[in-house]
Amino acid sequence: MNKLELIKSSIKSIPNHPKEGIIFRDITSLTEVPEAFQATIDLIIERYKSKGITKVIGTESRGFIFGAPVALALNVPFILVRKPGKLPRETIAQSYQLEYGQDTLEMHVSSIQAGDNVLVIDDLLATGGTIEATVKLVERLQGQVKHAAFVISLPDLGGEVRLRELGVEPFTLVEFSGH
C-alpha cells in the first residue's frame, strides 16, 4: 500500500454526523495510525520544503495537528488562527459566511509581517470559507498566501475553485465525493 492509500484508508467515514445526510470524514482515526500520520506530514513537507515559506498557519482546530509539525520541519514560525476570544494578545478579526449564518476568525496582529510567504494548513477543504477568511487576515497584515495544504478535499463543494480564484493553489492528499 502506498502512502496515499494508507492515508485514505485510515480516515473513517461517519454517516449522518453532525446531521442527517452528511458523511463526516474523521481525521482523528488517521492520527491513531502513526504510519499514516507520519506519511501525511512527510508528504506536505516534501511539497513545500523549497517554496520559500516563511510562516505556517494552522486553522482552528484540526489545522493545528498538521500545521505544527510541518512548521517545525520547515524551521519557520507556526501561527494559530482561532475562533474569537481564544488568543491573548492584540488580534485582527475576519468574519465569513457559513451555510446558515456567519463566523469569525482571529489571529495576533504581530504574527505576520509585510512580505511573509504563508502556507495555510487545515484538515479538510470543503467550501473554502475558512481559508478565504484566513487569506484576508494575512493580506490585511501585508503577507501573502499562495499555498494551502489539506489532508482531505471534498471537491463537490467547490473549495478548490474558490481558492484558485483568490490566487491560492490548494494541495490535497486525498479526495472524497459528496458532502
From Swiss-Prot:
Q: GO biological process annotations for this chain's record?
A: adenine salvage; AMP salvage; purine ribonucleoside salvage
Reactions catalysed, as given in the entry: AMP + diphosphate = 5-phospho-alpha-D-ribose 1-diphosphate + adenine
> What is one term from the GO cellular component aspect held by the record?
cytosol
Molecular function in Gene Ontology: adenine phosphoribosyltransferase activity
Question: Which pathway does this polypeptide act in?
Answer: Purine metabolism; AMP biosynthesis via salvage pathway; AMP from adenine: step 1/1
- Enzyme Commission no: 2.4.2.7
Chief localisation class: cytoplasm
Q: Which SUPFAM superfamilies match?
A: PRTase-like
> What UniProt keywords are attached to this protein's entry?
Cytoplasm, Glycosyltransferase, Purine salvage, Transferase
Question: Known InterPro entries for this protein?
Answer: Ade_phspho_trans (IPR005764), Adenine_PRTase (IPR050120), PRibTrfase_dom (IPR000836), PRTase-like (IPR029057)
Look up the domain of life of the source: Bacteria
Where is the protein localized? Cytoplasm
Q: What does this protein do?
A: Catalyzes a salvage reaction resulting in the formation of AMP, that is energically less costly than de novo synthesis.
Quote the NCBIfam families the UniProt record gives: apt, PRK02304.1-1, PRK02304.1-3, PRK02304.1-5
Could you give the subunit structure recorded for this chain? Homodimer.
Q: Which family does it belong to?
A: Belongs to the purine/pyrimidine phosphoribosyltransferase family.
Q: By what name is this protein known?
A: Adenine phosphoribosyltransferase
